[in-house]
């Protein structure tokens, strides 16, 4: 009899319990938005501010509809700025003329529109590229003109000398300025540290930094160059930790650390010896929050095996940082079917030892559904929404469950949320006859309309990715 009473009480409790929302996946799903050469956005220089904003909003809307949750936006292509800067001139990729005010702040606009849609916005900087071509017309306040002693001509490039401590410090200060003034979610750098080798007969053209080596160097030249980049990466990471510890630092190096590593790997470029990028060291030391090796090869590539390279990077991670490879969605075509990208993402999920993630190179191929790749990903890979993962190595407390009030408003409900510090997004889950649906919105929003539902659950997603317990309303 006592057992029957316990069973009855348990069933009654279940009947009275509020519907609990399903746990959401945690996965970084991003796309690079390149502004250099107008690759992704704006589609050409000189568009009106209205046209530029319209293009970016469409790109963000399509990204959300696809299932992405982050954008990596290039804001400093070549010592220029896609934001209001006291250090560097306006980028010519906006107006066609370096230094000309575009009439709005593209980065501020991008942050607002991304967060409004539940997208993280990572600001992507090229730390040392000063000009893509030495013949380009530059403004009088460009670093090439204001500090020519920091600049080296290398082939067609103009380059900030990584061997000059003042030049390194300048690039760090440019990035810290953005961290301090803008509500970005991450600072991102790609594979350009020392420049890619410029051909010179049968040998690469030497980088012209012997004067810097004589002033600042010690030991062997190649080791000194690597130490310059190591010091830059470590200093930047530590400075951002002190300034805004919740802002991620991510780097997307060349996908092969060294030729022959792992065994059997072939590479036409030695990033360790020619770009002086010891990306394995940065990962091992924990000087990044995520590493995004550019694994642009196919799964069945013999000399550059995608799963073999991914497994190697995952295994070089004693600090348990995020390993989120970049994938070459732009190569979908006759030789690479769209299914390759879905299969690569599946491999990333299976081989990851932490939270999985990836970024598409580049946004244009996804947004414009190159050879049907977007439709395929929506149908097979991104059926369920995902939140960006937390950084488990950062000390942060779980946000409090949100406080909200629901009131009728015509055919919808008005949901009012109480402000919370240290929260990036509200995660709203609604249960209807069709199941649970999810939307993610900016935590600055304190009033939103929702459709009537059997249950509504709201959680707070903290700045470091920690999710609160949900506050639940049920009919």
Q: Can you name each region flagged by the protein language model?
A:
Residues 34-54, 123, 128-181, 274:
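Active-site-adjacent "subsite" loops/lids of carbohydrate-active enzymes
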Residues 81-96, 129-155, 191-216, 261-270:
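Aromatic- and acidic-residue-enriched segments that line the glycan-binding/catalytic groove
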Residues 66-102:
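Aromatic-lined carbohydrate-binding/catalytic grooves of carbohydrate-active enzymes
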Residues 54-80, 182-185:
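Catalytic domains of carbohydrate-active enzymes, especially glycoside hydrolases
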Residues 276-302, 313-314, 319-394:
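Substrate-binding cleft of secreted/luminal carbohydrate-active enzymes
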Residues 411-422:
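Conserved aromatic anchor
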Residues 170-176, 180-290, 294-309, 316-320:
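Active-site neighborhood of glycoside hydrolase catalytic domains
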Residues 448-468:
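Beta-strand-rich modules
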């Amino acid at each position: 009899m006592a057992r029957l009473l316990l069973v009855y009480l348990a069933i009654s409790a279940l009947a009275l319990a509020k519907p609990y929302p399903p746990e959401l996946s945690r996965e970084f799903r991003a796309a690079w938005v390149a502004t250099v050469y107008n690759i992704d956005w704006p589609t050409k220089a000189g568009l009106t501010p209205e046209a530029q904003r319209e293009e970016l909003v469409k790109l963000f809307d399509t990204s959300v509809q696809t299932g992405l949750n982050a954008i990596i936006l290039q804001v400093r292509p070549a010592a220029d700025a896609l934001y209001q800067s006291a250090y560097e001139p306006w980028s010519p990729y906006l107006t066609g003329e370096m230094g000309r005010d575009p009439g709005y702040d593209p980065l501020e606009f991008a942050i607002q529109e991304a967060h409004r849609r539940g997208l993280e916005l990572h600001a992507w900087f090229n730390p040392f590229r000063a000009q893509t071509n030495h013949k380009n017309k530059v403004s009088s306040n460009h670093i090439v003109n204001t500090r020519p002693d920091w600049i080296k001509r290398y082939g067609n490039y103009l380059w900030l000398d990584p061997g000059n401590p003042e030049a390194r410090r300048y690039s760090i200060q440019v990035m810290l300025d953005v961290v301090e003034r803008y509500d970005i979610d991450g600072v991102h750098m790609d594979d350009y540290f020392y420049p890619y080798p410029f051909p010179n007969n049968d040998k690469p053209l030497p980088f012209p930094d012997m004067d810097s080596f004589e002033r600042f160097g010690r030991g062997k030249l190649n080791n000194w160059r690597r130490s310059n980049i190591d010091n830059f990466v470590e200093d930047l990471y530590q400075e951002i930790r002190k300034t805004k510890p919740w802002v991620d630092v991510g780097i997307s190096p060349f996908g092969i650390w060294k030729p022959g590593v792992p065994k059997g790997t072939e590479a036409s470029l030695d990033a360790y010896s020619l770009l002086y990028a010891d990306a394995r060291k940065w990962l091992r030391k924990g000087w990044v929050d995520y590493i995004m090796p550019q694994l642009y090869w196919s799964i069945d590539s013999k000399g550059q095996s995608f799963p073999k390279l991914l497994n190697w990077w995952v295994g070089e991670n004693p600090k348990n940082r995020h390993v989120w490879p970049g994938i070459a969605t732009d190569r979908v075509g006759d030789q690479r079917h769209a299914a390759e990208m879905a299969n690569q993402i599946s491999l990333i999920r299976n081989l990851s030892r932490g939270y999985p993630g990836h970024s598409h190179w580049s946004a244009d191929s996804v947004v414009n559904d190159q050879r049907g790749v977007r439709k395929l990903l929506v149908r097979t890979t991104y059926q369920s929404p995902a939140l960006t993962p937390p950084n488990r190595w950062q000390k942060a407390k779980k946000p409090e469950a949100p406080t909200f009030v629901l009131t009728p408003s015509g055919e919808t409900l008005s949901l009012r949320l109480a402000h919370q510090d240290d929260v990036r997004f509200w995660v709203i889950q609604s249960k209807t006859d069709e199941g649970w649906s999810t939307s993610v919105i900016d935590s600055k929003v304190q009033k939103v309309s929702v459709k009537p539902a059997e249950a509504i659950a709201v959680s707070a997603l903290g700045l470091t990715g920690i999710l609160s317990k949900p506050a639940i309303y049920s009919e």
